[in-house]
A protein has these predicted regions:
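Acidic, metal-coordinating catalytic segment for phosphate/diphosphate chemistry
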Residues: 2-13, 24-46
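Long, intrinsically disordered, low-complexity Ser/Thr/Pro-rich regulatory/activation regions
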Residues: 230-287
Length: 287
């Protein structure tokens, strides 16, 4: 029988294999102060102020007095001052440049930039949207050479252009208005305190750019829950019987309720019965 030697005992100097290094879970240090670039990024406000007049949706525009884009039309706006909030800056710039006191519904539209929108460098703009029921006569001030209410059609259709990226901001503001009046009472923000159904219909026609059937619109508007409240008064509008006057229900703002059912705009490809697209001649013609 062969002799089997036992395995040699391990040397006292032998070390066990070192464990694999654990993956690092340490987070990079968090900066305690804003980066230097934050102090160099100007913040501006721009205002899309809309109203309805002469059967057309109009926007308040200024002609720029200074470069860049001197002499070009633009939306009212300017830079945020130290300690100023963006809504306050929007009201201040609108009043300074146009003399128009913001009346109606003002809301934040969206933020634009900062790269590529201003030839002077990166600028972040917080755009606001104003729905005005009163066509105040504007008066140029600040760095505005002139100011006017202009139909939105030429700018939306590409026949005219605004300074900076204001074509895009205007288009976004108009689309916001078109969408919101389907589901909210926002169209009443363009109306006086008391209005007829015909006046309200003309607001929808101007904002949507579409002719609506008067009877269908009257039926839908008066049956939409929480939309209108009859005042019990009437107003004569020429030939025919006087028209009933309506208002928003007391305590309800222009966006406080959701219309049930909504007043949906006709599709651009397949207009509903009694609706047709408005042409340039329609926009130029008084209501």
């Amino acid at each position: 029988m062969p002799h089997v030697r036992p395995d040699p005992a391990p040397s006292a100097s032998a070390q066990p294999p070192a464990p694999a290094p654990a993956a690092s879970t340490a987070r990079p240090p968090v900066p305690t102060a804003p980066p230097a670039t934050a102090a160099r990024l100007p913040i501006a406000v721009d205002v899309v102020a809309l109203t309805v007049a002469d059967g057309a949706l109009r926007v308040l525009l200024v002609d720029r007095l200074l470069e860049p884009y001197a002499g070009r039309p633009a939306l009212p706006g300017g830079f945020l001052l130290d300690g100023e909030d963006v809504a306050g800056a929007a009201v201040r710039e609108l009043t300074e440049e146009t003399g128009v006191a913001p009346r109606g519904h003002l809301e934040q539209l969206r933020t634009y930039g900062p790269v590529g929108r201003d030839p002077r460098g990166p600028v972040l703009s917080v755009a606001h949207l104003l729905f005005s029921p009163v066509l105040d006569l504007p008066r140029a001030g600040g760095d505005a050479a002139a100011v006017r209410w202009a139909p939105v059609g030429p700018f939306l259709e590409g026949g005219a252009h605004l300074a900076f990226d204001h074509d895009r901001i205007l288009a976004d503001g108009v689309e916001r208005a078109r969408a919101k009046i389907e589901y909210s009472p926002l169209a009443t923000a363009f109306c006086p305190e008391e209005f007829t159904i015909a006046e309200l219909r003309r607001v929808y026609e101007a904002v949507w750019g579409t002719r609506l059937d008067p009877r269908n619109f009257h039926r839908k508007a008066t049956r939409s829950e929480g939309f209108l409240q009859a005042t019990g008064r009437v107003r004569s509008e020429g030939v025919g019987r006087p028209a009933a006057l309506f208002r928003r229900p007391p305590g309800s703002g222009p966006t406080a309720a959701v219309l049930q059912p909504p007043l949906l705009r006709p599709g651009s490809d397949a207009p509903s019965s009694g609706a047709r697209r408005v042409t340039g001649a329609d926009r130029a013609a008084p209501s």
